[in-house]
Amino acid sequence: MGVDQPLGDNFITTSLDSLVNWARKSSIWPMTFGLACCAIEMMATGASHNDLDRFGIIFRASPRQSDCIIIAGTVTKKMLPVIKTVYEQMPEPKWVVAMGACACSGGVFDTYSVVQGIDTALPVDVYIPGCPPRPEALLYGLLKLQDKIMKDKNSFGSTIGLGERLESAA
């Protein structure tokens, strides 16, 4: 959030979009959706060593309290409708993080029952590669999501998230 013009000791001016984006970036509440071994690394990221709370990132168990979903692990075709339902229950704006090679591209499982990347079903905002990715990689991906949120131009008064905005532009 940049300072456009100082008015004195106790005042600064900025755009409303910058203020709203700063608040959104500073309070990401991800819904954890651990499907395989990447979930272990996601739990390690949430431990005290990395301290996600200092970035305003607090894991939530309910989709109605979350604004981000982390898909971690292998997505099967049988699990895909459940993931879509959870995604639809999240309030706007909402973001999707694909964690691990399986969530990003299907990984080593090139079979009929595995979805070859969650981006075929949901609009992914951040991809975190690796098998499994280290906790530092997930932390870096969440910080990149914060950067992406800060660059959002139409957040105030808008009822759509970044992923849906990208879909409607295509």
UniProtKB/Swiss-Prot annotation:
EC code:
7.1.1.-
Instruction: List, alphabetically, the PROSITE patterns matched.
Output: COMPLEX1_20K
Return the cofactor note field: Binds 1 [4Fe-4S] cluster.
- Give the location in the cell: Cell inner membrane
Which Gene Ontology cellular component annotation is one that this UniProt entry carries? Answer: plasma membrane
* Binding-site residues, [4Fe-4S] cluster: C37, C38, C102, C131
The record's section on InterPro entries has: NADH_UbQ_OxRdtase-like_20kDa (IPR006137), NADH_UQ_OxRdtase_20Kd_su (IPR006138)
Q: Could you list this entry's UniProt keywords, alphabetically sorted.
A: 4Fe-4S, Cell inner membrane, Cell membrane, Iron, Iron-sulfur, Membrane, Metal-binding, NAD, Quinone, Translocase, Transport, Ubiquinone
A Gene Ontology biological process term? aerobic respiration
Q: Which cofactor does it need?
A: [4Fe-4S] cluster
Q: Whom does it interact with, and what assembly results?
A: NDH-1 is composed of 14 different subunits. Subunits NuoB, C, D, E, F, and G constitute the peripheral sector of the complex.
| Official protein name in the record | NADH-quinone oxidoreductase subunit B
